[in-house]
Swiss-Prot record:
It comes from Ranoidea citropa. Hypotensive neuropeptide. This is Caerulein-1.2/1.2Y4. Belongs to the gastrin/cholecystokinin family. Expressed by the skin dorsal glands.
Length: 10
């Protein structure tokens, strides 16, 4: 699931 920062939430 992609986060708003462009990273991914684990």
């Amino acid at each position: 699931q992609q986060d708003y920062t462009g990273w991914f939430d684990f």
